């Protein structure tokens, strides 16, 4: 009887031991799963994936009611690099102001968009192009945060790279007027603050680089910061131009050898009021089977105008004249889009480009050239272009 009793107790302890072992294993499994989950959570917090990065970036931009960016933009063209100081202002909804100052010649232009329209203002000439355009929604823009967000969201194959300094998002770009540009890299610090944008061609060469010195996503801007009238000091420009004209008109001479005077006395003195071109600038890029067929210089009421005609498979005309300062602020309607050339922001239409550079106004027109060919010809009329003196 006693033996049977101890046998029962022994069996009971065996089952109890098995139960405790199994229960312990279950507890250990739960502990291990908890530890694994915590490790995964910590790992996820340490390094983002592409979706996390895009969400963080887009959330910051979309939550911003207005922002202000300051930095530099470099545009590479051949062996030359053109550098701009750039300030970007944005206010919801659809208010933009981009101030570009060429570091080489201090030439300033301003891209402005408000409910009245889209403008490219050149204060030094007291002029502005006014566009019938949906800019900036119709293309990528390395200096506008909304466009960068759209680029990465629209690229299902965008990638994320973790670096020592932060993150790099790589995505495709959409530059319909520049097929050379294919992809971009957007650089962030470890807190996903944007630092730099590089736009590449198919040969992995950086063609555009925007470096942000400061980014304020909580800028206190209002509609008054986007007024066209504030960009042009019309009264000051008018006074300066009037004073210049008066000074020219009052400059007189009486000798036979007087030169370069606006008014004078004497038989051999001639009135010299018109602006003259010191040189003719020819494009370095000319499409194949196309040649310069004529070069004509004509006198207009405001100065000399050079007309270069190119004939062949791709006919086109280039008009060059000294840029004229308007006494009153002038708005020139354009059906097209702003175009960033090497040294200037121009106006691109379906068959022409207009722009100002180094005190010369250019107009390029053709019914044969494609948009990319138009741009190639225009860009080749830069500092490296063939220059022939007219004197």
Predicted regions and their residues:
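An acidic-aromatic
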Residues: 87-143, 201-211, 364
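Short, Lys/Arg-enriched N-terminal segments with co-localized hydrophobic residues
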Residues: 3-27
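Sec-dependent bacterial lipoprotein signal peptides
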Residues: 19-43
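N-terminal mature ectodomain segment of secretory-pathway/periplasmic proteins
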Residues: 46-121, 168, 173-178, 182-190, ...
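Flexible, processing/modification-adjacent segments and terminal tails
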Residues: 49, 115-178, 390-391
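Gly/Pro-enriched, hydrophobic low-complexity segments
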Residues: 164-232
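N-terminal leader/targeting segments and the immediate start of mature chains
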Residues: 32, 41-95, 156-161, 256, ...
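Short, solvent-exposed recognition patches
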Residues: 246-358
């Amino acid at each position: 009887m006693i033996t049977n009793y101890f046998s029962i107790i022994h069996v009971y302890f065996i089952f109890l031991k098995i139960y405790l072992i199994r229960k312990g294993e279950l507890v250990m499994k739960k502990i291990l799963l908890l530890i694994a989950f915590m490790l995964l959570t910590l790992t996820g917090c340490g390094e983002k994936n592409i979706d996390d990065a895009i969400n963080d970036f887009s959330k910051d931009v979309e939550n911003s009611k207005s922002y202000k960016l300051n930095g530099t933009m470099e545009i590479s063209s051949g062996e030359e690099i053109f550098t701009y100081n750039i300030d970007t202002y944005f206010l919801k909804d659809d208010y933009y102001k981009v101030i570009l100052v060429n570091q080489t010649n201090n030439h300033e232009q301003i891209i402005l968009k408000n409910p009245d329209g889209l403008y490219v203002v050149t204060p030094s000439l007291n002029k502005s192009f006014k566009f019938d355009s949906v800019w900036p929604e119709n293309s990528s823009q390395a200096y506008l945060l909304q466009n960068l967000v759209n680029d990465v969201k629209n690229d299902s194959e965008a990638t994320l790279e973790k670096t020592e300094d932060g993150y790099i998002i790589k995505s495709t770009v959409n530059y319909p007027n520049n097929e050379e540009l294919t992809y971009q890299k957007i650089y962030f610090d470890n807190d996903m603050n944007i630092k730099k944008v590089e736009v590449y061609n198919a040969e992995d060469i950086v063609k555009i680089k925007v470096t942000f010195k400061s980014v304020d996503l909580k800028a206190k801007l209002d509609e008054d910061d986007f007024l066209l009238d504030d960009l042009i000091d019309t009264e000051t420009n008018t006074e300066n131009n009037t004073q210049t004209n008066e000074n020219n008109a009052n400059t007189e001479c009486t000798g036979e050898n007087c030169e370069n005077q606006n008014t004078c006395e004497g038989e051999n003195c001639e009135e010299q009021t018109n602006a003259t071109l010191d040189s003719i600038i020819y494009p370095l890029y000319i499409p194949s089977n196309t040649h310069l067929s004529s070069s004509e210089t004509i006198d207009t009421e405001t100065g000399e105008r050079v007309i270069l005609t190119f004939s062949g498979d791709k006919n086109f005309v280039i008009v060059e004249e000294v840029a004229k300062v308007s006494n009153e602020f002038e708005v020139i309607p354009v059906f097209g889009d702003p175009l960033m050339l090497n040294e200037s922001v121009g106006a691109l239409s379906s068959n022409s480009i207009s722009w100002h550079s180094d005190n010369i106004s250019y107009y390029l027109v053709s019914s044969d050239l494609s948009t990319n060919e138009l741009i190639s010809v225009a860009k080749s009329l830069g500092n490296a272009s063939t220059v022939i003196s007219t004197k």
